[in-house]
Swiss-Prot record:
Binding site for Zn(2+): C336, H387, H513
Cited InterPro entries: aa-tRNA-synt_IIb (IPR002314), aa-tRNA-synth_II (IPR006195), aa-tRNA-synth_II/BPL/LPL (IPR045864), Anticodon-bd (IPR004154), Anticodon-bd_dom_sf (IPR036621), Beta-grasp_dom_sf (IPR012675), TGS (IPR004095), TGS-like (IPR012676)
Cellular component, GO, one term: cytoplasm
Protein's name in the database: Threonine--tRNA ligase
Subcellular location field: Cytoplasm
Organism: Gluconobacter oxydans (strain 621H)
Entry keyword annotation includes Cell inner membrane: no
Domain TGS span(s) in chain numbering: 1-61
Start and end residues of each stretch annotated as Catalytic: 243-536
Similarity field: Belongs to the class-II aminoacyl-tRNA synthetase family.
Gene Ontology MF terms in the entry: ATP binding; metal ion binding; threonine-tRNA ligase activity; tRNA binding
Assembly and binders: Homodimer.
Length: 645
């Protein structure tokens, strides 16, 4: 007689094994109609799953956020059936749900193109309208392999062969079509609804390995209703307008080319933006008593073996050999082992703790070419990386100080709110469970003391310790995980870091790994899209253009520019003979925040006509007033703040 506990705390008892369908019907016809799936003891399962013992049950309806992932998962199955209905020779591979949508990878001699989408979407709507039940079946392993091999589905057969011997072979059937899948699924294809759209195609190697066959990946998006779908498409349209790759070209900030895949050629204006941001971060770290260091980029494998990165991270490292010296080295993918070497260099005392060590460290990580994205996902990048060596008793205070610093930085850069995620131990990790218990407990206690509220992000910690992830929301509602704080007891032990305590004995420090921006490259990409290239004056690569109306005003334009430069502004002059409206249009497209227009009258009266980006009106100011106002506005927020103090 299973006792079923519902979310409101009420308990219903049933005579023998019961399904979610039966439980929902016992509560009422409305829920019986609306329930699409359920959670049993926190685990999502099919609505028809049998329950034979006491359990907590929560039903999932279309109104629930949890329904979205299942709608997208089922939409991937509907997509695969539609494709094979239209092109039976196509092999299906895998098709998961992802953020905002789903994809499915197909093997076909002729790759799909967006021109195929109307036919596929029409067939998908037919499958949804058929309202065919999803039925789970458990097959014998050998029978399943033989079935897919006989169908010519070699990829599916390979997937089954690679599954653990003790894993059930779960097959989901929707009418005559079926697929290998762990589930769970909704009740029927009709539960997917019609709020879906195919978005794009891309190439993808089977299992992400370039040595394997190239597949065609079809991406789609799916939502609970048309209103959500339309809102998402509107966000994508806005995101396209803000794409940092396009804006980067238009503003002449950077470029990437085939001879250096995944690495950035910073142009003058882009590098100016980079250095302004780096200088700002350097000042923030100095105010918070960080000592800046610099460590090598190319390091012997012995250090990576000792730290554990060689075992856990080698496939993402760029490795070099030195034949004459019989050495194997790697470009560092992160700075932490090198910072431990500095900490270990000489005898450390408890009086030096906490020791905050920062580096704008150049790192390299291998990313598949298909995963690269502008300057946001690259192979060569610079981290705003720091490591705090401290005692257990100092973790809470250091956490509070870091969060305060992070909040100030984000606010200065235009992000006033952020969320925090607590990521605990991953499946692949270094250190014993006892060490992880200690690390997770310390970080939770630190959050409690520091007043940091968080949501759980299970299994997503670093391989050496749990972490807090700080997630920004941008101007169009997208989330960006940037900052991190990680508690690490493992690396100091592995690399033999120690200090002399008050008792004159050696002790292991705790190592806090922390970053605020993450990488400069990615964060600059985020900033470009946050502001759509229309930066506040202090960040703008070119802050002011002085444009002359007539050639007679060229000398005065140069004088104005020189005066602004002397006040510390980044200024360009435009004394070409082009019409002033053409000049204004050109510099507005380049997203220059301020254009100062000067002609004969302005030269005679020593004034300027100031135009703001996006504004039609001009403000007439004396040269001295304009310089004073712009110099004040162009101050970085932290400098302006401390000037007031």
């Amino acid at each position: 007689m299973p006792a079923i506990t519902l979310p409101d705390g009420s308990v219903r008892t049933f005579d023998g094994t019961v399904t979610g369908t039966t439980i929902a019907a016992s509560i009422g016809p409305g829920l019986a109609k609306a329930a699409m799936a359920m959670e049993v003891d926190g685990k999502p399962v099919d609505i028809g799953t049998e329950i034979s013992s006491d359990a907590s049950v929560k039903f999932i309806t279309r109104k629930d956020e949890d329904a979205l992932e299942m709608i997208r998962h089922d939409a991937a199955h509907v997509l695969a059936e539609a494709v094979q209905s239209l092109w039976p020779e196509t092999q299906v591979t895998i098709g998961p749900s992802i953020k905002d949508g789903f994809y499915y990878d197909f093997s076909r001699e002729k790759p799909f193109t967006p021109e195929d989408f109307p036919a596929i979407e029409a067939k998908m709507r037919e499958i949804v309208a058929a309202n065919t039940p999803f039925v789970r079946e458990v097959w014998d392993r050998d029978d399943a392999i033989r079935f897919f091999e006989e169908k010519g589905e070699d990829f599916k057969a390979q997937l089954i062969q690679d599954l653990p011997e003790d894993e059930q072979i779960s097959i989901y059937r929707q009418g005559e079509w079926l697929d290998l899948c762990r589930g769970p699924h909704l009740r029927t294809t009709g539960d997917v609804g019609t709020a879906f759209k195919l978005m794009r195609v891309a190439g993808a190697y089977w299992r992400g390995d370039h040595r394997n066959p190239m597949l065609t990946r079809i991406y789609g998006t799916a939502w609970r209703d048309k209103k959500e779908l339309d809102a998402h498409l509107l966000r994508l349209e806005e995101a396209e307008k803000r794409d940092h790759r396009r804006i980067g070209r238009e503003m002449d900030l950077f470029h990437i080319q085939e001879e250096a895949v995944g690495q950035i050629f910073w142009h003058r204006k882009g590098w100016r933006l980079y250095t302004v941001l780096q200088d700002y971060m350097r000042r923030a770290q100095e105010r918070n008593n960080y000592e800046e260091v610099r460590t090598p980029q190319l390091v012997d494998r012995a250090l990576w073996e000792a730290s554990g990165h060689w075992d856990k991270y080698r496939e993402n490292m760029f490795i070099a050999t030195v034949e004459d010296e019989d050495k194997t080295l790697a470009l560092k993918p992160m700075n932490c082992p090198c910072h431990v070497q500095i900490f270990r260099h000489g005898l450390r005392s408890y009086r030096e703790l906490p020791l905050r060590m920062a580096e704008f460290g150049a790192c390299h990580r291998y990313e598949p070419s298909g995963a690269l994205h502008g300057i946001m996902r690259v192979r060569g990048f610079t981290q705003d990386d720091a490591h705090i060596f401290c005692t257990d008793d100092q973790i809470a205070d250091e956490t509070a100080k870091f969060v305060k610093m992070l909040a100030e930085v984000y606010s200065d850069l235009g992000f006033d709110t952020f969320r925090v995620k607590f990521s605990d131990r991953p499946e692949t990790r270094a250190g014993s469970d006892e060490v992880w218990d200690r690390a997770e407990g310390s970080l939770k206690k630190a959050c409690e003391i520091a007043g940091v509220e968080y949501e759980y992000n299970p299994g997503e910690g670093a391989f050496y310790g749990p972490k807090l992830e700080f997630v920004l929301t941008d101007a169009i509602g997208r989330d960006w995980q940037c900052g991190t704080l990680q508690v690490d007891y493992v690396l100091p032990e592995r690399l033999d870091a120690s200090y002399i305590g008050e008792d004159s004995n050696r002790h292991r420090p705790v190592m806090l790994h922390r970053a605020i921006l993450g990488s400069f490259e990615r964060f600059i990409g985020i900033l470009i899209e946050q502001y759509a290239g229309k930066f506040p004056l202090w960040l703008a690569p070119t802050q002011v253009v002085v444009a002359s109306i007539v050639s007679d005003a060229a000398d005065y334009a140069n004088e104005v520019a020189a005066t602004l430069k002397a006040a510390g502004l980044q200024v360009e002059t435009d004394t070409r003979s082009d019409k002033i409206n053409a000049k204004i249009r050109e510099h507005s497209l380049a997203r220059v925040p301020v254009i100062l227009v000067v002609g004969r009258r302005e030269a005679e009266e020593r004034k300027v006509a100031m135009r703001r980006l996006g504004g039609a009106a001009q403000e007439i100011l004396s040269l001295d007033d304009a310089v004073a106002a712009l110099a004040k506005e162009a101050q970085a927020p932290d400098i302006a703040r401390f000037a007031k103090d």
